Regions:
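Structured-RNA-binding interfaces characteristic of tRNA pseudouridine synthases
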Residues: 1-186
Length: 186
């Protein structure tokens, strides 16, 4: 079966997360249903990482094995058509080898957190940023962030139901850029 790599973005507000669950709609479930409607057979869709409930993605990588060969633009367009009106978009599709695995072939992941540092409430960024109405000490934040760089055991930060094999992770970079009242942390 030919394997295809998907690059997708989604608004996770109304999803229980990436992984298919019984307690509500998931991104994985929506993609698998779209693939079923496209090819007429169940297709498992695996991601590089499983986002939690309410988490958005701008470049999530996933893969799926289709029962036959298709043009990559056809796959992208068909999945997007079957995903409507869900807030999920397949941005790119690439044919890859059967050895490629979205999760295990990933060499790094990038996360972005947005802080809006002002007294007025969020409107457009609601659900996409953390509003902090008090002044922030950016120098103290930068100094504290240096302690997170490198290899550390993040057990204390894991959810009880976390299924990752290890809580030991390596943080290569941590950058904080302020533009007006927005602080972007990557």
């Amino acid at each position: 079966m030919p394997r295809y790599k998907l690059t997708i973005e989604y608004d996770g507000t109304n999803f229980v997360g990436w992984q298919q669950q019984d307690n509500g709609p998931s991104v994985q479930g929506a993609l698998q249903t779209a693939a079923l409607n496209f090819v007429g057979a169940h297709v498992a869709c695996m991601a590089a990482g499983r986002t939690d409930s309410g988490v958005h993605a701008l470049g999530q990588v996933a893969h799926l094995d289709l029962p036959s060969h298709y043009d990559t633009d056809t796959i992208r367009d068909a999945l997007n058509a079957h995903l409507r009106p869900a807030p999920i978009a397949v941005l790119d599709v690439e044919r890859v080898s059967e050895q490629f695995h979205a999760r295990f072939s990933a060499t790094r992941r990038t996360y972005r957190y947005v802080i809006v540092n002002r007294r007025t409430p969020l409107t457009v960024k609601r659900g996409r940023a953390w509003l902090v109405p008090r002044p922030l000490d950016e120098n103290a934040m930068l100094e504290a962030s240096k302690h997170l760089l490198g290899k550390h055991d993040f057990t204390s930060f894991r959810a009880a139901e976390c299924q990752a094999k290890s809580a030991v992770k390596t943080l290569d970079t941590l950058e904080s850029v302020r533009t007006g009242d927005h602080i972007n942390i990557t």
